[in-house]
Regions:
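Short helix/strand-capping hinge loops at secondary-structure junctions
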Residues: 137-139, 144-145
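C-terminal helix-rich "cap/oligomerization" subdomain common to oxidoreductases
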Residues: 31, 116-117, 296-335
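Bacterial N-terminal signal peptides
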Residues: 11-26
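A contiguous active-site-proximal alpha/beta segment in oxidoreductase catalytic domains
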Residues: 146-206
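N-terminal secretory signal peptides that target proteins for export/translocation
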Residues: 1-10
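Rossmann-like dinucleotide-binding domain that binds NAD(P)(H)
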Residues: 194-261, 305-312
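C-terminal substrate-binding/catalytic lobe of Rossmann-fold NAD(P)-dependent oxidoreductases
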Residues: 240-289
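N-terminal glycine-/serine-/threonine-rich beta1-alpha1-beta2 phosphate-ribose binding loop
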Residues: 4-5, 22, 28-136, 158, ...
Length: 335
């Protein structure tokens, strides 16, 4: 809460100074002409194209007024093919199509913007890249995965806490319309538990669930809530099954396929019936709504402590898989 308070105080101070400088009646006009300036770190993911289009192009179906991407830091890493194979293409598109200024380093970026989207596809880069953002006291959204390990994720949490700056991380699948519908289902009585499915595509340089399995993990946490204590993971061919045991005894199941089937689904079991989701995600609109709301209010829609637990869940799953599916307590990762 102290992080949020500090951010809100800064924004109120800025607004009060601006109000003193602008005649009454001209404030709304000035605000309309001065959108919140957004900076992007890491141009090696398709998210930067979707987000820039939504914030800069009024004709976009997901357009959100009042924001503009004005600067970006290229980033990228030679350690991950998913990064180096795409970063030049996305950088050129952001610069040439959307006229976003490409800057040489993150401190320069922070000096030009009000808020930051940390988008680097390799979560292992996030800790070092977010440090100058916290030093500049800029609110930041950190795209999935939060980090490449629980250790790095915990350090991000501690740095944000020390800087008194708000941040959050989330997958777009947390805000899929089907996730929201089935979080509070109708007509099936009391909810017992959930099964979710999503791709578990692997990258050679990323732990098993960190690159793409994170989407299904985030869905499961959004639906089940916090409180998972142990995780087990088994793999057969291209199929992965992860079972989390919550402290109230519920079992949340995540199923994924590392190749072949690319789909997302949710099944919710209640005392009076079962409901299933549709299998087509509806883009980034829901996530972008949460991000821009966060940038305006400074209130994270996902508790950072829950985000730490999702990283611990994935790391514990990797340990379980390496141990032949034996259950691994999250405490083995977080201690």
């Amino acid at each position: 809460m102290r992080n949020v308070f500090s951010f809100v105080v800064r924004r109120l101070w800025q607004a009060s100074v601006l109000a003193m400088l602008i005649p009454i009646g001209g404030f709304a006009q000035a605000a309309a002409k001065k959108p919140i300036k957004v900076g992007i770190i890491g141009l090696d993911t398709s998210h930067v194209i979707a987000f820039t289009r939504a914030l800069n192009d009024p004709s976009s179906k997901n357009y959100i007024p009042g924001f503009r991407v004005v600067a970006a830091y290229k980033g990228g890493t030679p350690d991950a093919k998913i990064s180096w194979s795409r970063v030049d293409k996305f950088t050129a598109e952001v610069h040439d199509k959307w006229h976003v200024k490409i800057v040489k380093d993150i401190p320069t970026l922070c000096s030009m913007v009000d808020v930051v989207l940390l988008e680097s596809v390799d979560g292992r880069q996030h800790l070092e890249q977010v440090k100058p953002v916290f030093a500049a006291h800029k609110p930041v959204f950190i795209d999935k995965p939060l980090a490449g390990s629980y250790k790095d994720a915990k350090e991000i949490y501690e740095l944000g806490k020390a800087a008194h700056d708000p941040w959050f991380t989330a997958s777009s699948l947390r805000y899929w319309s089907q996730t929201e519908r089935l979080e509070h289902p109708e007509g099936i009585g009391r909810v017992l538990t959930y099964d979710v499915m999503g791709p578990t595509i692997r990258e050679p340089d990323e732990p098993s669930l960190f690159y793409y399995g994170v989407h299904a993990v985030e869905m499961l946490y959004q639906l089940m809530g916090p409180g998972c204590e142990t995780v087990s993971m088994q793999t057969s061919g291209n199929e992965d099954v992860v079972v989390g045991k919550w402290k109230d005894g519920r079992l949340g199941v995540m199923r994924g396929f590392s190749s072949g089937l690319y789909a997302f689904s949710i099944t919710v079991y209640g005392t009076k019936g079962v409901l299933h989701s549709k299998r087509v995600p509806d883009g980034y609109g829901g996530l972008l709504h949460q991000i821009t709301k966060f940038f305006k209010t400074g209130v994270p829609p996902v508790d950072p402590r829950e985000s730490l637990k999702t990283i611990a869940f994935m790391q514990a799953a990797s340990l379980s898989r390496a141990r032949g599916g034996a259950p691994v307590p999250l405490s083995a990762v977080t201690k």
